[in-house]
Amino acid sequence: MCNGSIMDKLISFALPLMLSGVLQLMFNAVDIIVVGRFSGSQALAAVGSTTALIAVFTNLFIGISLGANVLGARFYAAGRHREMSETVHTAITLALISGIAMAFIGVLFARGALELMGTPDDVIRLSTLYMRIYFCGMPFFMLYNYGAAILRAVGDTKRPLIFLLISGSTNAVLNLVLVIKFDLGVAGVGIATVISQMISCVLVLRCLYKSDSSYQLRFSKLKIKKAYMIQIFQVGIPAGIQSTVINLSNVLLQSSVNSFGSTAMAGYTAANNLFGFLYVSVNSVTLACMSFTSQNYGVGKLKRMDRVLRDCIILSVSVSLALGVGVYVFGPEILQIYTTDPAVIQCAMEILLYTTVTYFFCGLMDLFPGALRGMGHSAVPMILSVIGTVGTRIVWIYGIFPQHRSLAILFISYPASWILTIVMQVICFYFVRRHVHRTHAELGANIENKQQ
């Protein structure tokens, strides 16, 4: 990450990440396709209506894994083996504790949270059932995500891809067996998901355990070291809060979609799944930007750090434009995989119009905070993202949408919030970058004076 062609290394790092995300979404799409095709539109709406809510519950803790990624990348690049080992064991312990806590919270509060979202009576029972089963697998989900974050920190994005391929294939097969053969509906989809999460968890922990490097995992060493936990939290908690609060705005948006009935809900579920393919593609570039920035920051290569961001911008815009236009152009054909209901497809296409061709704005919005987190600055980007993204959407949902009730007006809030947030993040990045370069120059001058 710290030497050689940046673009080549970015692509080789980001491509497995991108494929991992696409695979995960493809297997999630199998959930939706199978339940939509063989259990009906109510079951499809039930599974889809939980997506934003599950993200709210989980993203705080997944965000904290970014702290482990940044800290691990910095220590690994600098050759600080003891600190790297302590980071690994602290992160895995945090993953286990947070996973167990999330399982209890999700099971206990699923029904109440869905009621607060205004989930229609005809789907809430199925939504609650799916959500409770899903949360039973949360310890496995958290352990996999934290383990994969550690592997990304050392530049390994290929093995997580292999693990997802194995677990996701299992998930797809189990979906077909449990839903079609045993007619378990949303329960079958939930059970298949939990089993696949358990498999991916076992594979990533085994990988860390078998390692002979500084990121080797030893279960006897699992404990939280306060100093490392604080450093992980300094980067991870703001990232997690940002993701959680943004998803809260998506919950509000889901509630607004719910007001149009189960047809619009099913359309949003299908569109949101396609929307996810765009997200994982640009997010892989953001994660690459964060990891590359962190390693170069750790060894003091600030000019290379600037070139990393430049190349990431080129890569992110190119990927998101190509995929966004492609998804919209071929949207009607792709959506028929999810459902054959013309009304559902029409709703989905109306949503995709405003969220696909403009998605490169979202990629740019995330890149600058990614670079800032790589330098250890996470709080201010979080605040700006919350103000720009969530603030805009809340004003839109409660101010503009009630006056012009349509799916089109509702989803214009996405590009509007992205553009406003980009402006604020660019200004923030300019000042932080200037401070980092100045501090580094002063430190170099002080060292030179002492040597003289």
Indicate residue ranges for each PLM-predicted region.
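Transmembrane helical elements of multi-pass membrane transporters/channels
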Residues: 12-31, 133, 144, 167, ...
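Transmembrane alpha-helix boundary and packing residues in multipass membrane permease domains
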Residues: 17, 21, 33, 70, ...
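Short runs within selected transmembrane alpha-helices of multi-pass transporters and secretion channels
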Residues: 65, 134-152, 160-171, 189-204, ...
